[in-house]
Amino acid sequence: AGFAGDDAPRAVFPSIVGRPRHTGVMVGMGQKDAYVGDEAQSKRGILTLKYPIEHGIVSNWDDMEKIWHHTFYNELRVAPEEHPVLLTEAPLNPKANREKMTQIMFETFNTPAMYVAIQAVLSLYASGRTTGIVLDSGDGVSHTVPIYEGYALPHAILRLDLAGRDLTDHLMKILTERGYSFTTTAEREIVRDVK
């Protein structure tokens, strides 16, 4: 997350929401009902971690809203009603998801304006081109996206539900076969760090 005109993002953090596994464990620590991003990572031993984005598509809107709230108020420290917002989406994102993103931005955060762009198109723009093919492999999904004059060609986009999280799963399987135990979401994050 960041601001137009900056050379780099102001904030980079994982799209994770963590909730206490047991109530009362964090007494005296100003326990919150949910932790987001790096704070969730740092307390992962006593939290259950959830990923609101699966295979590049938002699957839990309440948690996604928490991530956006954290982005505006904790990371960027801005009032969202004072800034237009550029959101990115995965190629072939369902129209209903785009509508839900728009609804939350306007109705919950009162943004004055917003635009939703496909991640691969912005990657191509960053390289100074408007036509090309982008291979985008993230945590949950990989895409090859042909782009012509700034427009993704939906009929030619290829999607593969194989990405970083699958590599983590495979590494976890190999380590489990060697006698290591992974039962909590926190232990899964340790494997992710090893990867």
Curated annotation (Swiss-Prot):
EC number(s) stated in the UniProt entry for this protein: 3.6.4.-
Entry annotated with the keyword Cytoplasm: yes
Xref: SUPFAM superfamilies: Actin-like ATPase domain
Catalytic activity field: ATP + H2O = ADP + phosphate + H(+)
Group of enzyme by EC: hydrolase
Keyword terms, alphabetized: ATP-binding, Cytoplasm, Cytoskeleton, Hydrolase, Nucleotide-binding
Miscellaneous comment as given in the Swiss-Prot or TrEMBL entry: There are at least 13 actin genes in potato.
Domain of life according to the entry: Eukaryota
Cysteine pairings via disulfide bonds: none
Role, per record: Actins are highly conserved proteins that are involved in various types of cell motility and are ubiquitously expressed in all eukaryotic cells. Essential component of cell cytoskeleton; plays an important role in cytoplasmic streaming, cell shape determination, cell division, organelle movement and extension growth.
Key word Iron present: no
Compartment(s) of residence: Cytoplasm, Cytoskeleton
Major location category of this protein: cytoplasm
Protein's UniProt name: Actin-85C
Assigned protein family: Belongs to the actin family.
Cellular component GO terms held in the UniProt record: cytoplasm; cytoskeleton
Gene Ontology MF annotations: ATP binding; hydrolase activity
